[in-house]
Swiss-Prot record:
Protein name: Taste receptor type 2 member 7
Species, as recorded: Homo sapiens
Chain's gene name: TAS2R7
Transmembrane segments: 10-30, 56-76, 95-115, 129-149, 188-208, 236-256, 267-287
Tissues expressing the protein: Expressed in subsets of taste receptor cells of the tongue and palate epithelium and exclusively in gustducin-positive cells.
Topological domain spans for side Cytoplasmic: 31-55, 116-128, 209-235, 288-318
Primary site of residence: membrane
Amino acid sequence: MADKVQTTLLFLAVGEFSVGILGNAFIGLVNCMDWVKKRKIASIDLILTSLAISRICLLCVILLDCFILVLYPDVYATGKEMRIIDFFWTLTNHLSIWFATCLSIYYFFKIGNFFHPLFLWMKWRIDRVISWILLGCVVLSVFISLPATENLNADFRFCVKAKRKTNLTWSCRVNKTQHASTKLFLNLATLLPFCVCLMSFFLLILSLRRHIRRMQLSATGCRDPSTEAHVRALKAVISFLLLFIAYYLSFLIATSSYFMPETELAVIFGESIALIYPSSHSFILILGNNKLRHASLKVIWKVMSILKGRKFQQHKQI
């Protein structure tokens, strides 16, 4: 029964992976083509491209871990290969979260309407420093990933190996204090960007409220470009926050799996939930970006035209 559930979850993970690769690859391809055409890249496109690349890597690492867990479980008993996978999973996980946080910060400074001198100074400087901020996210993610991977790897692999040798439901003997401190470190590391996104979300709501009040006093109406920009930014940020909560819970399931009777099943269940976040959020970003939305509509129109042409030719031959 457990094998059937694992196989079903693996097929589900493959479907989520395919959808996520399609959406994120589309974002990266459109922005890179525009970069080559104009020989420069806008800050928002740089953030979206970096986010798409990190999520493609994250999707690949998670799916690879799912395949190894179901098809080649004995690999978990070795240290070198799984340590590499754990490192890249932790690295791409933090990169995708921090890049999404950078996107929320960028929306706040470019769309928010505040008149504080510090805010205006940051609003003017954000395009100049965004590349350095992204580079800082990479350095920070590497700094977080190295020690965390070593501790989690040692605890989890020992547990899986012990279970396979003794065939008992509970035979893991690990340093729970060390494991708890490692989990706490990882959770706090992801809590910081979540709080920053949450702060950006509430400040954007405050900015939208002030803008609508100002439009009502001037009797110009509320449906202006600035209001629409606020709404699109809020949709992108709130979708990230909700999906991040689901991803965070799945991450807790995966990292705490050896406290459960079916360790492998718990891991792949958590990973199948985790794939929802990098897969679905890309399409929300596409719908919220004018250039990406128009490009996606063109692709859909061309695909439909090709399909209609083939149907017409088949009907004509008949």
